[in-house]
């Protein structure tokens, strides 16, 4: 295979890995924790995975402590915790 073909294959595999959602079996345990603002009083918009709705939701983080179900962006939350409802086992 030519180096151009290998480069294309590598690019496609990288894209596939980025776009493939996390399966429920592989979802980190902390994704099931509730949103936790923590004891501090800052106002930081953040996102958490809501295991009931199975979607990432916005919440206000106080700036300290809390838990690991706390993401700076919706995209980061989705990449880490959202499982695809349409994904079929292989």
UniProtKB/Swiss-Prot annotation:
Pfam families (UniProt xref): Kunitz_BPTI
Membrane-traversing stretches: none
Site (Reactive bond for trypsin): 41-42
SMART domains tied to this protein: KU
Highest taxon listed in the record's lineage: Eukaryota
Protein name as catalogued: Kunitz-type serine protease inhibitor bitisilin-1
CDD domains: Kunitz_PPTI-like (cd22608)
GO cellular component, one term: extracellular space
Keyword field: Disulfide bond, Protease inhibitor, Secreted, Serine protease inhibitor, Signal
Disulfide-bonded cysteines: 31-81, 40-64, 56-77
Ranges where the BPTI/Kunitz inhibitor domain occurs: 31-81
Species this protein is from: Bitis gabonica (Gaboon adder)
A GO molecular function held by the record: serine-type endopeptidase inhibitor activity
UniProt xrefs under InterPro entries: Kunitz_BPTI, Kunitz_BPTI_sf, Prtase_inh_Kunz-CS, TFPI/VKTCI-like
Chain's role: Serine protease inhibitor.
Expressed in which tissues: Expressed by the venom gland.
PANTHER family: BPTI_KUNITZ INHIBITOR DOMAIN-CONTAINING PROTEIN (PTHR10083:SF374), KUNITZ-TYPE PROTEASE INHIBITOR-RELATED (PTHR10083)
Main subcellular location of this protein, as a coarse class: secreted
Subcellular compartments: Secreted
Signal peptide residues on this chain, from the entry's feature table: 1-24
Similarity comment: family membership: Belongs to the venom Kunitz-type family.
């Amino acid at each position: 295979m030519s180096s151009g073909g290998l480069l294309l294959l590598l690019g496609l595999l990288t894209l596939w890995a980025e776009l493939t959602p996390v399966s429920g079996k592989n979802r980190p345990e902390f994704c099931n924790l509730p949103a936790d603002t923590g004891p501090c009083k800052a106002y930081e918009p953040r996102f958490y995975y809501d295991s009931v709705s199975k979607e990432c939701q916005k919440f206000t983080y106080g700036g300290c402590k809390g838990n690991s179900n706390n993401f700076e962006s919706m995209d980061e939350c989705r990449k880490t915790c959202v499982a695809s409802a349409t994904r079929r086992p292989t």
